[in-house]
């Protein structure tokens, strides 16, 4: 087999001819996707690109990019700079779930990070070069604590959120 097959080179388009053998490789489903939740746990751009390479290797074609949630806002919006100044940061993360019998526990580690508009463009192009469509997700109106911590004037007057949910 040509080495390019193992390097992720897509020029063969799933069709390779071997003497006396014909292999046709085609996906069964038109929508083959994976989701990455960077809203809750930020990952650097390089990790996202590695994930896209892995998706391409397995012929996945839809990348659900979960960019916001209560725990963090991960995409730069120049008109609303507080979304990344405040919303991309949290003091610590809750470990597991809590209830009456099990009090809340936290890891004590600060979390911070977001993607600039240029980085988002680079990710989209990188995905497109691998025949992957990026489906960005921005949570609204639910799961919006990071946005409301950044712009509390947008929330109900009865609710005050000082930082993204831990």
Can you describe what each PLM-predicted range is?
Residues 1-158, 162:
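Feature activates predominantly on carbohydrate-active enzymes
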Residues 165:
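Ser/Thr-centric signal marking residues that sit
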